[in-house]
Amino acid sequence: MNPNSKHNTNFTNLLKPSDSDIKQFAAQHICRLTDLLNRYAYEYYTLDAPSVPDAEYDKLFRELEALELNHPELKLPDSPTQRVGGEPLAGFAEVRHEVPMLSLTNAFSPQDENGVFDHAEMYAFDQRVRDGLDGGNPEYVIEPKFDGLAISLLYRDGVLVQAATRGDGTTGEDVTQNIKTVSNIPLRLHGENTPELIEVRGEVLMLKADFVALNKRQAENGQKPFANPRNAAAGSLRQLDSRITAQRKLHFFPYSVARQQDGFVAEEHIQELAYFQALGFSLPNGNFGCFKNIDEVLAFYEHMQQKRPELPYEIDGMVVKVNSLAQQHELGFISRAPRWAVAHKFPAEEALTIVEAIDVQIGRTGAVTPVARLQPVFVGGVTVTNATLHNQDEVSRKDVRVGDTVVVRRAGDVIPEVVRVIFERRPMRETAVAVSDGIGHRQDDLFAETPSANQTQSVPLHKPYRLPTHCPICRSEIEREEGEAVARCSGGMLCQAQRAQGLIHFASRKAMDIDGLGEKQIEQLVAQDLVRHFADLYRLDIPTLQKMKETADKTVAESDQMPSEGSSVGASGKHKKQPVKWAENILAGIEASKTPELARFLFALGIRHVGERTAKTLAQAFGTLERVRRAPEPVLACLPDIGTVVARSIAHFFAQAEQQAMIDELLAAGVAPQTQAVTIPPARHAEPQRWIARLPGFKISENKAQALWELAGKNIEGLQTDKALPTDWQAWRSEPQNAALLENLKTFFAQMPSEDEAAQGSDGINKAVAGKTFVLTGTLPTLKRDQAQSLIEAAGGKVSGSVSKKTDYVVAGEAAGSKLEKANALGVSVLSEAELLTLLG
């Protein structure tokens, strides 16, 4: 074919878009971006409820800027590149700014995987400044870019007369009355030489601590919490009732003078900041400075990025300004921002990504946490692939599903979390729906005379997420107690995820108090599968401990080419194991822990809801481990400070065959908890009408329970067999589990000492101490506070933290304070340590 023929077809030209096609595409894209960015700006500035992170807005804004630069004729009148912020809310008087409140151009310094910043945009800013100053060498001031609300304060003759929000940069809202409630804004300027007029620009914000306190109050009052401190500050400042604003504890930092008449005239911005302080304003001291060149500025920026999580307020970058006000004037402005300043943003702490899967993690305490597995996204200086979903309630509230596009936040060292779902990007599928055919028939009606038109509707591709019913590690049931947000694996020490924490608690000072065995050694023993259960600690020996240490030190020992501690090198060069003191100390500590107080042993078991105080109550009520193991749930629920939830937890623990086997192993290993004096006899607290009223599945008041007890002849056997008792009771006792519970109660009470036997000291009770309330104050000569408390409680006494008329004795040591004074005022007996020991016998 002749290449010069006019009929020759150039397929490349056919596929290449024409200029008109490109222009049409650009026009459509500009229109879409303008609408989208205006909607996002409305959400951010007007509703105070942004739906996308700042980084997403910035990316789209730059895309629109680039398109408008290439096609200036296509720029729309409402393009966000031509204005600042959003329109003011209704409800406040409008204020027109004599000097427009402009925003700043953004600059970014992205980090690579090693945390190294790319400061190319800041070096370009520095070069533009130098070019604008004909090669001059500018100084820069760098200060925090607060994440709050821009405010303009107008003072006449030193008195605050007006406060206005930025609004759209030209017109804002009059919030004078609300601003007057901000405690660190001077209502009258300080100093003698105050200007006749000065307009101060700055940022209103909420400190992190005040934000936490506010959200706590919101939750307590059943109100919706704020998403972040900026939203809280904006919402507080826009309250029509200034009394509400006053309760919110807002804060203000100034950053520029918009206009001024008379008074001190600064030549540099750093002088302006000092002038603000002289007038009575607060400054972010220690977090701003003046530097001679851009490299010093960037070093301070990196320092502040590291310091950011420790600051008392939220910042999302640093503002860099030319220090000389004359140079600022020379550089001037572009359409929407000054040429002499830039907002140097920190790496994004929020980003968009997709949820690829949701599974659960089991924590060291058994807490079950749903975790979103994410498409990798770079946020907060690191690549994030996982984010916490906290608990089932949070998953349901946010409605996070597999496939969703979500906003992920990572701030400092905080664990990444899913903030919200972008619902318009949720993957959907089409499904057929039954519809009317227009004459009364449905599409699924077999008798329809005419078929209906097919119709479909969009539904989410994935179902709502629900926690699994069993632990993925040990297959134990996952349980969630009523009123608690966190679900937990019920496996305890049976679950490998909980094993290390359980052993650390078991060996801790307030539990078994195993001297020499710390967290590090326990974690190494568990990691190497040398210890699985509590009893395994009592089977440890020197070779096992040496193996643990040698394995843990292997990498270090190899790199240093030195023998690890506890070994020696013979003539052959081979390592020979030798007994070492550290291992002997651990074994000695384990041996010494074999006869713990009963309360310590019970606390060491790690029973859910059983802290030190509850463990002591159990010991004082039952006296021996065997009685505690067999205590029925209704009896437990009658004891002081033990309600239904705690009683159920204790009974559930001892009802598990695995937990009973674990205790039997400890006893077989030589652990022998001491017998405790019974000072809270169940017969006194678990009176028949009380435990009957707490029987599971049988609702009855204590008064009616008392009547039932009397009808049964005041004995459990009557409750079991008397056929004259009410039919609802007979129906309840006929259930096998309930019949077994009654038999257990009968056996249990038969083996417990009576109240009289307990009072006579059959369990070794000290009559002079039993039932008495003691308060400890000051430093005792020889006893530590917890030692004195243990001695008193072992003798049947009770230790309280405060002095009252019900206090029997105050034990006072050196530097006793107000408790001793109150004891003397109330006439309470005061004992020295020696007198206490005498009383204890």
UniProtKB/Swiss-Prot annotation:
Residues at which Zn(2+) binds: C471, C474, C489, C495
Gene Ontology biological process terms from the UniProt entry: DNA repair; DNA replication
Cysteine pairings via disulfide bonds: none
Keywords for the protein's UniProt record, in alphabetical order: DNA damage, DNA repair, DNA replication, Ligase, Magnesium, Manganese, Metal-binding, NAD, Zinc
UniProt xrefs under SMART domains: BRCT, LIGANc
The BRCT domain, residue ranges: 764-841
Gene Ontology cellular-component terms listed: cytosol
Domain of life of the source: Bacteria
Residues bound to NAD(+): D54, A55, E56, Y57, D58, S103, L104, E143, R166, E203, K321, K345
Catalysed transformations (reactions): NAD(+) + (deoxyribonucleotide)n-3'-hydroxyl + 5'-phospho-(deoxyribonucleotide)m = (deoxyribonucleotide)n+m + AMP + beta-nicotinamide D-nucleotide
Bias (Polar residues) ranges: 561-570
InterPro entries for the chain: BRCT_dom, BRCT_dom_sf, DisA/LigA_HHH, DNA_ligase, DNA_ligase_AS, DNA_ligase_CS, DNAligase_adenylation, DNAligase_N
Residue numbers annotated as active site: K145 (n6-amp-lysine intermediate)
GO molecular function terms listed in the Swiss-Prot or TrEMBL record: DNA ligase (NAD+) activity; metal ion binding
Family (UniProt): Belongs to the NAD-dependent DNA ligase family. LigA subfamily.
Stated role: DNA ligase that catalyzes the formation of phosphodiester linkages between 5'-phosphoryl and 3'-hydroxyl groups in double-stranded DNA using NAD as a coenzyme and as the energy source for the reaction. It is essential for DNA replication and repair of damaged DNA.
Name by which UniProt lists this protein: DNA ligase
Organismal lineage: Bacteria, Pseudomonadati, Pseudomonadota, Betaproteobacteria, Neisseriales
